[in-house]
Design a protein with these regions (language model features):
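Active-site helix of classical SDR
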Residues: 122, 157
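SDR active-site lid
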Residues: 174-242
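Conserved glycine-rich Rossmann-like NAD(P)H-binding loop of the short-chain dehydrogenase/reductase
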Residues: 32-48
Length: 292
């Protein structure tokens, strides 16, 4: 049975909704009574999630970097579900490996999906949020607070979405639109499980403090993000201790540098890191779509 709280019968758009955090978030929001528009690659995955929800849904398969496709999707969402009052920009991809030998097209694709795609999502749906005095939640990452080696495109993109959200918030606040940032730590998704198959990435995560290297269940992360949507939060940290990393962010680069200097030479000598390509089933779906 759907909930009767502030999200009941409100339309919420979730990108990257076919799997992982996006799918879990769609389920949680629908459980609170929201109508859900699911956007992303993998039509079958989007439709499977949509069919599992207890409220009205609409699923749209698209490339999140395609402005025209997003404009068409926004029109379809209004037609089928009503004007959105919340948008969650969650879609993202990642790849790992040394920057010096990285594939320029693949590196650029990570930036395009994570940063440009988030901005394109906001652009397409901002007229709706202005009309409803709604809420835009940008899903960011621990990587927005502190960058790690071997993940340069992902870290750059997540730093970028944080800055974009701060800028957008200041721009639209006087119109009654709220903008929040979701800082998310390692989550148990296919993307992270795929990253752990690569020894250098796995060991670098292993050198983080115990709470920081733990994998958190997608449902737990989604519940906190759904709370943020419900309360129009300016920032949400998943888990809550991540707020401490935010407070200490100026001290993080020297710590990361010290660990990298000590460990990367050893790790690369033992097993030279190869480029991962786009990680996880979501990355494979992105590759398949952009090849066609």
């Amino acid at each position: 049975m759907s909930g009767g709280g502030p999200l009941r019968d409100r339309t919420v758009v979730v990108t990257g909704a076919a799997r992982g955090i996006g799918a879990a978030l769609a389920r949680d929001l629908a459980g609170r009574g929201a109508r859900i528009a699911l956007l992303g690659h993998e039509r079958s995955g989007l439709e499977a999630v949509a069919e599992s929800l207890p409220t009205r849904t609409w699923a749209g398969e698209l490339d999140i970097t395609d402005d025209a496709a997003l404009e068409r999707a926004a029109e379809q969402v209004r037609t089928h579900l009503g004007t959105p009052s919340a948008v969650v920009a969650n879609a993202g991809v990642a790849e790992g490996g040394p920057f010096v030998t990285s594939d320029p097209a693949l590196w650029r694709r990570v930036i395009d999906v994570n940063l440009t795609g988030s901005a394109a999502t906001a652009r397409a749906f901002l007229p709706d949020l202005l009309a409803t005095k709604g809420y835009h939640l940008q899903v960011a990452s621990l990587a927005s607070i502190g960058a790690a080696p071997m993940m340069s495109a992902y870290c750059a993109s997540k730093a970028g979405v944080e800055a974009f959200a701060h800028s957008l918030r200041a721009e639209v606040a006087h119109h009654g639109v709220a903008v929040g940032i979701g800082y998310v730590n390692w989550t148990d998704t296919d993307m992270i499980r795929d990253a752990d198959r690569h020894p250098v990435l796995r060991e670098l995560r292993g050198h983080m403090p115990p709470p920081a290297r733990r994998l958190y269940p997608a449902d737990q992360v989604a519940a906190r993000l759904a709370d943020a949507v419900e309360h129009r939060s300016t920032a949400v940290y998943v888990p809550r201790w991540l707020r401490l990393a935010q407070a200490a962010r100026a001290a993080l680069p020297p710590v990361v540098l010290r660990v990298a200097r000590r460990e990367l030479a050893r790790l690369e000598a033992e097993d030279p890191m190869r480029h991962t390509g786009l990680l996880g089933a979501g990355g494979e779906a992105d590759r398949a779509r952009t090849r066609t």
